[in-house]
């Protein structure tokens, strides 16, 4: 799958670096001057995590993003998978 969260499907995004200089007009300046845009990538913060599944009585390894991991710790793995319409059997 590459750099992709196995539960939510988050993956690398692409965008621009936009350098800005000068004080904004709102703050009393002459306006911001935008330089040349440079392409860049926004990579997902992925973590390989081992989760224990009490229903199966064993552990499973899942590659998840950090934001997904926070949600799993709040809700629990089975509730979060159900919310994202995934099944535990998909990760075995």
Curated annotation (Swiss-Prot):
The source's domain of life comes to Bacteria
Tell whether Ribosomal protein is among the UniProt keywords.
Answer: yes
Q: Does the keyword Ribosomal protein apply?
A: yes
**Record GO terms (molecular function):** structural constituent of ribosome
Q: Which GO terms describe its cellular component?
A: ribonucleoprotein complex; ribosome
Checking Pfam families in the record gives: Ribosomal_L28 (PF00830)
Task: Give a GO biological-process term.
Answer: translation
Q: Could you tell me the keywords of this UniProt record?
A: Ribonucleoprotein, Ribosomal protein
Annotated region described as Disordered, given as residue ranges: 1-34
Matching entries from PANTHER family are given as: 39S RIBOSOMAL PROTEIN L28, MITOCHONDRIAL, LARGE RIBOSOMAL SUBUNIT PROTEIN BL28M
Protein family membership: Belongs to the bacterial ribosomal protein bL28 family.
- Spell out the protein name for this chain: Large ribosomal subunit protein bL28
Q: Which organism is it from?
A: Borrelia turicatae (strain 91E135)
């Amino acid at each position: 799958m590459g750099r992709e969260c196995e539960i939510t499907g988050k993956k690398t995004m692409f965008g621009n670096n936009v350098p800005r200089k000068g004080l904004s007009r709102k703050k009393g300046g002459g306006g911001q001057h935008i330089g040349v845009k440079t392409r860049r990538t926004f990579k997902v913060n992925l973590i390989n995590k081992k989760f224990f599944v009490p229903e199966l009585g064993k552990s499973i390894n899942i590659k998840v993003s950090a934001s997904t991991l926070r949600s799993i710790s709040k809700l629990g793995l089975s509730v979060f998978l159900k919310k994202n319409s995934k099944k535990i059997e998909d990760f075995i």
